[in-house]
Structures are given as structure tokens and as C-alpha cells.
Design a protein with these regions (language model features):
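Eukaryotic helix-grip
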Residues: 19-221
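Bacterial N-terminal signal peptides
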Residues: 4-15
Length: 221
């Protein structure tokens, strides 16, 4: 009952947001003509970004091919999201969970400016026809702990992972990220840090998936 109640509130508060950013992540509009341009490359992975109309912020995207079966990659992405595998994490509280949804409260460290916190809903969806799994991370309001002392609440997070078949029975992993930091930080000051964080996230996840042991892969074949 607690899980159902919390997730219902999440659905209502997410849909009630007045100014939804015009993103292309996870949509058919995510094509070359959407305005993506290369921003930076690290360890062979290129981060693209595109300006989001009506905001001063960018949406980020990165794609990497991995020699890991998609089913194994999807399971490990879920474990990473559930476990909070991120360098900036100070505190995580899983408020509710089911096999395909998580409701999470996080506090994260942000250099120079005040630390941030947020509540996000993570949903896992499998498309059998295309053999792809989507993990969408969406900020929600009105549930979870209040803003912690010394923190600023991040008002908008839209991010996630797309796991689908790649070459030679491997995985094509796509990462999307968009956020607005809240507080008094201007878009001009935030953009570089957001891009750096997005690139670090995809590089870290790619390394994690490449380290899956033969035993891990065999159990998921």
C-alpha cells in the first residue's frame, strides 16, 4: 500500500509540472537534425549536447558500444541505479520499490556551490519487439523528505539509460541527461559542470559493464 500510494503521488506531481522542457530523449525526434553537436570526448566516448528551447541549458547524450549481452547490461544498469553507484552521492534513501520502479531520495556533493538533493522516480521498461530496455529517471515533487539543511533542491531532472542490441551480440548503451540545478546558479555557470558530470557518468557506467565477469554473463544468457 505504501508503494502504491507513493508512486501514485509521483505520477500526479510529475504530470502537474507546468514547464516541461522540450527534450528529445527517448523519442523519435532524437535524430541528427535535432541539433546535437559534439562537446567532448573521453576514453573514446563522445558527449553530444543540444540547446533546449526556452531554457539556458543543454540536453546531453552519449552512445557507446559494449561487448556485453543486452540482458546482462540491463540487469547491471538496474543494480547501479538501485545501489547508488555514483561518485558524488552523500546519502541515498530508497523510499519505495517494485521490480520496475524505484522512488529515491538523494543528497549529492557539488563543488563550490551548496550541495543538492532531489527525489526521483526511476522506471524500467522493456520493449520485446525491439529488444531494448529503457531506464527513465524523473524528478518528482511533493513526496519524500523536505529539502535538507544546507542543500538546494534540484527542481528538474530528466535522464536515463537505453540498452539495446549492438554489433556482434553486444550492447549499444545510450545515456541521456538534462537537469536544472535550482538555487541562484545561472545557466552559464552550470553548463560546463553539467556536461562534465554527464560525460563522467557514461564513462563510469561503461567501465562498470565491461567488468562484468563471465559468470555474470553466463547467468543472464
Amino acid at each position: 500500500m505504501r508503494l502504491c500510494s507513493l508512486l501514485l503521488v509521483c505520477a500526479l506531481t510529475t504530470s502537474a509540472l507546468a514547464a516541461e522542457p522540450a527534450l528529445v530523449q527517448f523519442t523519435a525526434a532524437d535524430v541528427a537534425a535535432a541539433g546535437w553537436k559534439p562537446y567532448a570526448t573521453k576514453e573514446g566516448i563522445t558527449l553530444d549536447r543540444r540547446p533546449v528551447p526556452g531554457t539556458g541549458f543543454y540536453e546531453h547524450r552519449a552512445v557507446v558500444e559494449l561487448p556485453v549481452p543486452p540482458a546482462a547490461a540491463a540487469d547491471d544498469v538496474w543494480r547501479a541505479l538501485r545501489g547508488g553507484d555514483m561518485a558524488t552521492l552523500k546519502r541515498r534513501e530508497v523510499l519505495a520499490e517494485s521490480p520496475t520502479e524505484l522512488l529515491i531520495y538523494d543528497q549529492i556533493h557539488t563543488p563550490v556551490v551548496s550541495d543538492r538533493d532531489y527525489v526521483i522516480k526511476v522506471t524500467r521498461t522493456y520493449d520485446a519487439a525491439r529488444e531494448r530496455t529503457e531506464f527513465r529517471c524523473t524528478s518528482v515533487s511533493g513526496v519524500g523528505p523536505p529539502v535538507a539543511a544546507g542543500h538546494v533542491r534540484i527542481p528538474i531532472i530528466r535522464a536515463g539509460w537505453l540498452v539495446e542490441p549492438g554489433p556482434a551480440a553486444g550492447t549499444r548503451l545510450t545515456y541521456y541527461a538534462y537537469s536544472e540545478p535550482g538555487g541562484l546558479i545561472t545557466a552559464l555557470l552550470a553548463r560546463s559542470a553539467q556536461a562534465d558530470r554527464s560525460l563522467a557518468d557514461i564513462v563510469h557506467m561503461a567501465k562498470r559493464l565491461r567488468r562484468l565477469s563471465p559468470g555474470d554473463l553466463a547467468r543472464r544468457d
